[in-house]
Amino acid sequence: CDFEAMPAEETLKRHLGTFSKLLTTNQALVLSDYGKGGLSHISTMIAEARAVKLPILVDPKGDDYSRYHGATVITPNRAELRQVVGTWTSEASLIERAQNLRQALELDYLLLTRSEEGMTLFGPQGQLTVPAQAREVYDVSGAGDTVIGILAAMLATGMPIEEAVQIANRAGGIVVGKLGTAAVSYEELFG
C-alpha cells in the first residue's frame, strides 16, 4: 500500500502562480498523473496552457479521465485505457471506444501505447498505427516516460504529431532494449 499524504490544498494553490508564469517561457507542457493528488488543479493548468497555445501532453492515471478534458493528447497504455473504456473485443471496437473518449474529452489526440504492437494515434482524421521497432526487450522501465518526453520535445519544435509519434516510438523501442531506466542519445535516435 501507498501511505503518502495528499499535498495540502494551500500548497498546491500557491504553486499555481509559479506554474502560470512558467507557461510563457516553455513550448510544451507534460503532466504525469501519479494519482498522488499533486495534480488536483489539472483542469486549471490545462485551460491556462490552452490559452497560450501550448501542446499539453498527459500521462493519465485512474478510471476518470474527465479531469484531462481539453488536453492536446493523452498517452495511456492498454491497461490504463481499459480502466476507462472497458475491454474491447476487436480492433474496430477499440477504435470506436478510443475515438468516443477522445471526442467526449475534447482531446486533439489519444496516443495508445501497445507494447509489442507499437502505438496507435487516434485523431480527428482517423488513426495511425506505428509498429513497434523490431528489437529485443530487456526492460520496459521508463518507456512510457521516454515516449511522452520525446513526443513533447518534437511537438515543441512545431513538428506535426504524426511525425513526432514515429520518433517517440523509435525512442521507446531504444530504451526497452537497455537494462534499467535509460536515456536515448541524439545519435541513437537520429543517427
Tell where the protein language model's regions lie, with residue ranges.
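Short alpha-helical functional segments enriched in proximate histidine and acidic residues
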Residues: 22, 104, 174-175
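Conserved post-catalytic alpha-helical subdomain immediately downstream of the catalytic base
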Residues: 108-109, 133-190
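Conserved N-terminal subdomain of the carbohydrate kinase-like
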Residues: 1-28, 182-191
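Solvent-exposed alpha-helix faces
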Residues: 20, 99, 169-173
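A short, flexible beta-alpha/helix-coil linker loop
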Residues: 3-6, 80-82, 135-136
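Extended, hydrophobic alpha-helical segments in both membrane/secreted and soluble proteins
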Residues: 30, 45, 54-58, 64-67, ...
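Conserved phosphate/ATP/ADP-binding segment of small-molecule kinases
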Residues: 32-127
